[in-house]
Regions:
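Surface-exposed beta-strand/loop patches in extracellular or lumenal glycoproteins
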Residues: 223-241
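Short, acidic Ser/Thr/Gly-rich low-complexity loop/linker segments typical of extracellular
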Residues: 53-57, 61-83
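Structural motif
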Residues: 32-55, 237, 413-418
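Structural beta-strand segments of beta-rich domains
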Residues: 38-42, 153, 228-230, 404-410
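Long, compositionally biased, intrinsically disordered segments
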Residues: 1-17, 27-31, 103-150, 167-220, ...
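A short, solvent-exposed loop/turn motif at the edges and junctions
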Residues: 9, 62-64, 83-112, 118-120
């Protein structure tokens, strides 16, 4: 709907059609729950793995049923009205797709853009396993391949293992057989958008996988729990040192966060003797036995199975999982030593003020017949209409095509030397629910002139002064850091010395 041009535009009035329309786009909102003083609008987009828009995704705010829900339309975009001033978790669900969550710091009386989300279907390769088997059973997922190389998740279910799914009401239901799938999130360029939840800031984007059981997904179970740890494997496609720890975490959708789990280990298959794999778990390129294997819980039955699955020379990550859900195997990461934030380096050198300039800015002049608004750069005039109580008013900011009030110069770098490791400079401007993004090559004394057309995200002209938020970012290629041996659970813990550059595709946080 069009906006009233005679008054300044406020977000509460501009967006009430979303949840008060007939019918409303956002349905199930408790009457009166949206407060004009704290209102905010979350905007986002949902896509399929191939980048096409995904319609019909149910979008809610986790643990806030009073805000109702909305469905993504044909273009995959959505708007959701909430009360801001806090952290909120956006929950995405669609039948046949793995669910996703994203946490946002939502302001008052403003729009906030959620990162794009990619929702994927479960792996088509399924293994049906009976839990009363007397031998170790194996599931191997579909082999995936991208610029980092091929890999496939493998799970080895020990004999005598029992399992039960934990339902949303807290009850458990035993399972006698399992239709197991392993679905990797971290494949291809849009891997970060596919993640089940936001990674912690210090955790590198490396490898994440959903271990699932069909019956549990159909029942909406929180997880599937096992009576003993399940060894999981994936090729060492990034090249971490043999013998090093593999930080692991699982995603708890009830808490909407990653939970640190026990570290795994990078191992190497050296060969096989008598049908049993010779395995190096310490990094000395020698077959380990006894205590070294006992410390990580590797049994003879597991080594017999490894001998049938992997050739000599294969390096693997091995992680024990006690339950099925989304798991993340990731090292800590960060930028190189010379890196800095945009607010810490490369900022403009302060310039001295002219001697005749006062600290206070010019005041607006609003005398009758002569209106000069210096701060907003507006010229105005008013003329009495004879015989009426009204006046004819003119304001230069209302003239079609005027851009002076819609422009601002944004300084991206100063005169000081920039870091050698700086890859690019990023600029974001948010105004009227719209997000404008630009990327620049590193350069000194860089200034960009931003021009706004005065319209909001729905294509309507806004009236009155509107808040704009500007963010400047310095982007670097991150590098992995080795974990400390003293950490039993290294997930989301800062590391020590650098190992090498991290995977492309971005990081968490």
């Amino acid at each position: 709907p069009a906006l009233d041009s005679t008054v300044a535009t406020y977000i509460a009035e501009a967006t009430k059609f979303l949840y008060m329309g007939n019918p409303p786009i956002q349905f199930g909102v408790v009457p009166g729950v949206i407060k004009p003083e704290t209102i905010a609008v979350i905007r986002g987009k949902v896509e399929a793995k191939d980048g096409s828009p995904l319609a019909g995704v149910a979008i809610r705010i986790y643990d806030h049923p009073e805000f109702g829900a909305t469905l993504s339309p044909e273009d995959g975009g959505f708007d959701m009205v909430v009360n801001g001033g806090t952290l909120l978790t956006v929950d995405y669900q669609k039948a046949g797709r793995l669910p996703a969550q994203r946490q946002l710091d939502v302001p008052w009386r403003d729009y906030v853009t959620a990162p794009d989300v990619t929702m994927i279907a479960v792996d088509t390769k399924v293994s049906t396993l009976a839990l009363d088997a007397s031998v170790m059973q194996v599931h191997q997922g579909t082999t995936v391949n991208d610029e980092d190389g091929p890999r496939a998740a493998a799970l080895l279910i020990p004999a005598g293992t029992s399992a039960a799914m934990k339902l949303p009401d807290g009850s458990t239901q035993p399972l006698s057989s399992l239709n197991i799938r392993s679905t990797e999130f971290t494949v291809g360029d849009n891997g970060p958008e596919t993640m089940p939840g936001d990674l912690p800031a210090a955790t590198g984007f490396t490898y994440a996988v959903e271990y699932s059981v069909d019956a549990a997904l159909a029942a909406g179970a929180d997880k599937v729990e096992f009576s003993q740890p399940i060894p999981t494997y994936v090729e060492n496609f990034v090249g971490f040192p043999v013998g090093s720890q593999v930080p692991a975490g699982s995603y708890d959708r009830k808490q909407a966060r990653w939970v640190p789990e026990a570290n795994g280990r990078v191992i190497k298959i050296l060969g096989a003797t008598g049908g049993v794999a010779d395995v190096d778990v310490t990094g000395d390129d020698l077959a380990d036995t006894g205590t070294a294997l006992d410390e990580i819980g590797m049994t003879t039955a597991e080594r017999e199975t490894l001998a049938t699955l992997y050739a000599a020379g294969t390096e693997l990550w091995r992680v024990l999982v006690g339950h099925f859900s989304a798991w993340d195997y990731n090292y800590p990461y960060g930028p190189k030593d010379d890196a800095c934030r945009a607010s810490q380096c490369g900022q403009p050198t302060p310039r001295p003020r002219p001697k005749d300039r006062k600290n206070k800015g010019p005041k607006d002049c609003n005398e009758k017949g002569s209106i000069i608004e210096c701060q907003s750069q507006v010229l105005g005039e008013e003329i009495d209409l004879a015989g009426t109580p009204m006046r004819l008013a003119y304001r230069s900011n209302r003239v079609p095509g005027r851009h002076a009030a819609y422009e601002m110069d944004i300084r991206l770098s100063g005169l000081d030397p920039l870091p050698q490791s700086l890859e690019s400079i990023l600029l974001e401007v948010r105004i009227g629910g719209r997000l404008f993004q630009q990327t620049f090559a590193p350069a000194n004394d860089l200034v960009e002139t931003f021009v706004w057309d005065g319209k909001d995200v729905y294509g309507r002209t806004l009236f009155g002064a509107q808040p704009a938020k500007v963010r400047i970012g310095y982007a670097y290629t991150p590098q992995y850091y080795a974990t400390k041996d003293s950490f039993e659970a290294s997930f989301n813990r800062f590391g020590s010395a650098p190992i090498f550059f991290a995977r492309s595709g971005g990081g968490g946080g």
